[in-house]
UniProtKB/Swiss-Prot annotation:
The gene is acpS. This is Holo-[acyl-carrier-protein] synthase. The keyword Lipid biosynthesis applies. Transfers the 4'-phosphopantetheine moiety from coenzyme A to a Ser of acyl-carrier-protein. Its cofactor is Mg(2+). One of its GO terms (molecular function) is magnesium ion binding. Keywords: Cytoplasm, Fatty acid biosynthesis, Fatty acid metabolism, Lipid biosynthesis, Lipid metabolism, Magnesium, Metal-binding, Transferase.
Length: 123
């Protein structure tokens, strides 16, 4: 049973500008250690910015699907987006008692990144 659907679009240069302005402080506030470490596979700032923009969009889409937004119960850095060995994007949330499965799709083109997520319960 579907319990929520979320979508978010991020302007990649916005993420790059925030990263340049606030550096590691921005990264640590928004992204998990795993996401930051995973960005090291990209050699260019643009590649890293695309990586971070897709993950930013995924976090926003996730809380939209939940219908809660961010707050005391869930922070951006509590959410980790990663890819399986076959490249499928996955999402996990630490400190969460929510038992939903997530189907996540990420994409980017030119200056935009997008995330689409469906949360569902196992029947």
């Amino acid at each position: 049973m579907i319990v929520g659907i979320g979508i978010d679009v991020v302007y990649i240069p916005r993420i790059l500008n925030l990263w340049k302005k606030f550096g590691n402080k921005f990264l640590k506030k928004v992204f998990s250690q795993e996401e930051i470490k995973d960005s090291n596979k990209y050699t260019s700032c643009e590649g890293k910015a695309r990586h971070f923009a897709k993950r930013f969009a995924a976090k926003e889409a996730y809380v939209k699907a939940l219908g809660t937004g961010f707050g005391k119960s869930i922070k951006m850095s509590d959410i980790t987006t990663y890819n399986t060995l076959h490249g499928k994007p996955q999402i996990t949330v630490k400190k969460s008692n929510i038992d939903y499965k997530a189907e996540l799709s990420l994409s980017d083109d030119t200056d935009y990144a997008i995330a689409f997520i469906i949360l569902h319960k196992e029947s």
